[in-house]
Amino acid sequence: MNIALVAHDKKKDDLIVLIKTYAHILKKHQLFATGTTGKRIAEATGLPVHCFRSGPLGGDQEIGAAVARGEMDMIIFFRDPLTAQPHEPDVSALMRLCDVYSIPLSTNMGGSEILIRSIEQGDFESLKLSHNDEPPA
């Protein structure tokens, strides 16, 4: 699976804790991230991470484009709901695309743990069957 990892500044440490905890599962998949988040994850875990641009410089949009092309299977996005983000429209657009293309999206630790454990159990088989379909009209 192709999994995108994104975190606002105040949530990066939380995301790294999640990735370290589930590295034994995530190492079997391709990890993608926005710039700073990806670099921090790679440094902290040793896992290979393909880095897009930083979120405010278009990284969220790059991940959104990958979703629209059928190239992402899951998004874990630890948002900071208490701090205004200058690129909030990009964040909203990414979340919208996840809904349009039925891509699993989690924005917090609890939901992310469920998604990652579901990967290990093979719970995303129907997603593979419909992954490249056009979105509904």
UniProtKB/Swiss-Prot annotation:
Catalytic activity: dihydroxyacetone phosphate = methylglyoxal + phosphate
Entry EC number(s): 4.2.3.3
Family statement: Belongs to the methylglyoxal synthase family.
Residue positions binding substrate: H8, K12, T34, G35, T36, T37, S54, G55, H87
Residues at the active site: D60 (proton donor/acceptor)
Any one GO molecular function term: methylglyoxal synthase activity
InterPro entries: Methylgl_synth (IPR004363), Methylglyoxal_synth_AS (IPR018148), MGS-like_dom (IPR011607), MGS-like_dom_sf (IPR036914)
Gene encoding the protein: mgsA
Protein name: Methylglyoxal synthase
Function: Catalyzes the formation of methylglyoxal from dihydroxyacetone phosphate.
One of the record's GO cellular component terms: cytosol
Keywords, in A-Z order: Lyase
Domain MGS-like: 1-137
GO biological process, one term: methylglyoxal biosynthetic process
PROSITE patterns named in the record: METHYLGLYOXAL_SYNTH, MGS
Leading EC class: lyase
